[in-house]
Amino acid sequence: MSTIHTGKTQLPDFQRGWVWDDSRIKALIASITNGYPVGAAMFLEYGNESIHFKSRVVEGAPSADKVTPDELILDGQQRLTSVYSSLFSEKAVRTKTDKGQEIERFYYIDMVKAVNSTIDRVDSIVSVPKDRKITSDFGRKIELDLSSASQEYAQNMFPLNIILDPSKYSKWQMDYMQYHQYDPNAAKLYMDFLSKVIVPLGQYTIPVITLDKDTPKEAVCQVFENVNTGGVSLTVFELVTAIFAMDNFELRKDWEERQKKYFSDDILSVTS
């Protein structure tokens, strides 16, 4: 996650935008915190003289205009972006509802539910709006308020975007214990949560297959097509765009410019 944050791991610019919704992110978090495998990722070492990909940072990562990446993500964009955005970034995660409405969310885990083996882990994952308040009755009734640290401590709700940073979660632990006046029950709950969720998550790894920078262009193209025909499948246009991108030709941009120049929107449109 740190290399995504610093821009050393980036995406080929032709890669589609991030498309995972809120429910899918919560399911991924649940799988990872349970230690379940979520599949491998595939990277390409940057610097192949015959492949001229433009690159861009992962959604939510700081701008890295002056950073030359070490590697590009060929497969695993959705999973890695979800993990980075929800478990590492300080920003609210830009995602969408099941119906496609764009939303911004922070992710929490209910410690009481998380340590209870009879409760499905996904049911302990909670997403809240950017203001960290869940409301009902058109905003008039507050169902859950996590807008301050004290509210987090009071409701045993751990902010997931600090879970990969030992210094941050250790400080949260100290403040949590202080808030509860070092109550033995609170201490036991946190230590259970630490051993069952935080420590295993810190040891969790996603397998990575790395193609070296000398891999032939044709092989990279074939691999990209093979790994991107499952999951959220790419369209034929997106696959062709990837092929042209290897020669530093931005097919999508060229198509959109020609469409704008020669055709009206109601005659021809490109579906992303």
What is each model feature region?
Residues 1-22, 26-272:
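Basic- and aromatic-enriched surface patches that contact anionic nucleotides/nucleic acids
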